[in-house]
Amino acid sequence: MDAYNYSIPLDMTENAATSRLFSSMPQSLFTIAASENVTLNNHHYGIWTNHFKETDSLNSFFNLLSTNKDRAGNEFVSTIESFKYPIYGAQWHPEKNNFEWAKSPDGTPKEAINHSPQAVLLSQYTAEFFVQEARKNNHRYENSDEEDAALIWNYPVTRTPSSSFVQKYYLKNDF
C-alpha cells in the first residue's frame, strides 16, 4: 500500500452521514473532510476495500464509513465503526493536524500534514467525538490515588526533533 505521508480527503460511503462518528458533524465540516486534503495517511499496510467486503467477520461487525485510494489507485478502508459497540477505526491520523509540526534539518515539514484551520477543525471535532464516547463508559478508578497513578503526567515527555514525532512518552511496562 502506497499511502505513506499522504494527505487526502475521505471518500465517504453512503453510510457515513448516518453513522455515529459523522452524523453530528456540521455539514460544512463533512464537506471539508470529503473534499479537501485534510486527513494524513501514514501507512504501508491496511485493509483493501474488496477484502473488507468479502470478509463476513469484518463487514458484519463494522460499518464502512469511508475509503480512499493509495497513490497507485488501490482502494483501502479508511474509516469504520462497529455496528453495535463503541469501536472505531481510522486509517488516517486526526490527531496530527493539531499537534505534529516536526521539521527536517533544512526546515521543511517532515510530514505532509495539513495545518489549515479546516484541518484543525476536523481534528478538534474527532477529538471531541471520542471524548464524548469515552464519557459514556461507566468504568471508574477505585480511588483518586489509583487514578492519579495512571495519569500521563507521571511520565516525562522527551523532545525528539529528529523523529517525525516532536515529542514522545516512554512508558515503563509497570501497569
Feature map (PLM): residue ranges:
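Amide-donor transfer/coupling interface in amidating biosynthetic enzymes
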Residues: 1-175
